[in-house]
Amino acid sequence: MDFGLFTCGYQHLPLETAFYDAKAFGYDYIELWGGRPHAFASDLLTGDASKIRDLIQKYQMPVYIYTPEHNAYPYNYMIGTEHQWEESMNYLSSAFRAASDIGAQYTLVSIGHGGSATPNQRKQRLERSLYCLCAAAEEADQTILLETLTPYESNTCTRLEDLREILDKIDSPALLGMCDVVPPFVQKEDPVDYARVLGKRMGHLHLVDNDGQSDSHLLPGDGIMPLRKIIQELREAGYDGMATIELVTNYMSDPSFYAELALNRVKELL
């Protein structure tokens, strides 16, 4: 597996710190958090993309995945008025263009909370959104990595079977599924089944630990997940690709320390 550093935890530091750390600690790539001050889509499209490309070149550290901030304020394509939906589509379409500008191959899109809409209404809205987004992604030469969230975060498409169904329905070359190990774990599903069921349509992995009763993304080894077994069985199931160690805001107090510790712990599991 290739292991990626997620830059979200570095948002109070210069972005260059994340690139420096990724190189120094032995990460293989960066998954770039698309929020301010580092890499908001409109900022990248108005000149900041060159700064990212300079960091990639300076540290010889590729950005494979761009992960725009969405599903909360102010963008969630699964909820709100028609105008708000259109703004969300425009925002994510701009994120695809920004990702291409920095040389990323993939843009990560997750499925937010659908509010009080009925299950059928949420399904229709998700399908409509993904048809629109896939067209925009193809135009920008991007591939979408579609991520399920936990039931603590979303009420739409939280399980593997939901993801398989929507991938079958949309059937776009610009759309792949992925597995964040937390949503299946808290719903008593086996994360490895994502690789078994999706096969070549599983394009990415978020690897962290969890307490089994929340959406917490914990440092590997600090939760109760059988990570060694999961990694081994993912490989046996045919998945040996990108795996971002997705440390988020829990570790912003000292992101460098935790990024190094997380990678060392994961490598001990191999």
Which residue stretches match the model-derived regions?
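N-terminal small/glycine-rich loop or linker at the start of catalytic domains
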Residues: 1-6, 65-78, 108-114
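Histidine-acidic metal/acid-base catalytic patches
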Residues: 1-4, 9-26, 53, 57, ...
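Active-site-proximal loop/turn and secondary-structure-junction residues that shape catalytic pockets
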Residues: 9-11, 34-36, 69-72, 111-115, ...
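Residue-level detector of anion-binding/catalytic polar loops
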Residues: 28-29, 62, 105, 143, ...
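Conserved beta-strand positions in the central sheet of alpha/beta enzyme cores
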Residues: 31, 65, 108, 145, ...
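Glycine-rich, proline-tolerant flexible connector loops at the mouths of alpha/beta enzymes
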Residues: 33-53, 111-113, 117
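Glycine-rich, aromatic-flanked loop segments that form ligand/cofactor-binding clefts
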Residues: 56-64
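Active-site acidic/histidine proton-transfer and metal-coordination neighborhood
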Residues: 58, 75-176, 186
